[in-house]
Design a protein with these regions (language model features):
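Charge-rich, low-complexity N-terminal segments
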Residues: 1-48
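Phenylalanine-focused residue identity feature
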Residues: 5-8, 31-32, 56, 68, ...
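Generic "edge-of-domain/loop-turn" microfeature
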Residues: 10, 15, 28, 77-79, ...
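Short, surface-exposed, charged/polar-biased interaction segments
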Residues: 22, 26, 91, 119, ...
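Surface-exposed, low-hydrophobicity interaction/linker segments
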Residues: 39-107
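Mixed-charge, glycine-accented linear interaction segment located at domain edges/termini
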Residues: 109-144
């Protein structure tokens, strides 16, 4: 598996094959020392890169999984970068998350994006920018 998504944060991963596997991406802060916590991108969720090999080991094999779902979100630093680059009148605290949902139903993969806000807004600018960023990311990494 390529490290393309390694900087994304993992909210959850679910794989259903011979048995069902669920990985909660929430970090257990008591497991880490202070220095390790300070070095992390997020103190809430692990990065995809930190668990990618575990999930790959669950998915690989002679048979495809029956289905799987992976929910990734951007770090606050990357959300802030999008805000600044697009001159949005928002702060990172206004945005709950920018997510990328990957779902395999046994035959095809569906990718959906979502911009979740902590404030009420009818403005869909952020959602449209997030969609465009994901499309550009896929193109840059030759995914589609």
């Amino acid at each position: 598996m390529e490290p393309v998504f390694d900087t994304f944060l993992l909210v959850e991963a679910y794989v259903r094959s011979d048995v069902s596997y669920t990985i909660d991406g929430r970090l257990n802060p008591s497991f880490f020392d202070t220095e390790e916590l300070e070095e992390m991108t997020s103190n809430t969720y692990t990065t995809w890169g930190a668990v990618r090999h575990h999930i790959f080991n669950v998915i690989k094999g002679n048979k495809l999984p029956l289905n799987f779902k992976i929910v990734l979100i951007l770090s606050d630093a990357n959300i802030n970068r999008i805000i600044e680059q697009n001159h949005l009148n928002l702060t990172t605290s206004d945005i709950a998350n920018l997510s990328l949902n990957i779902y395999f139903d046994g035959e095809k993969i569906s990718l959906t994006t979502m911009a979740s806000m902590n404030i009420f807004s009818m403005d869909k600018t952020l959602a449209n920018i997030w969609d465009a960023n994901v499309s550009a990311f896929f193109k840059q990494n030759q995914i589609f």
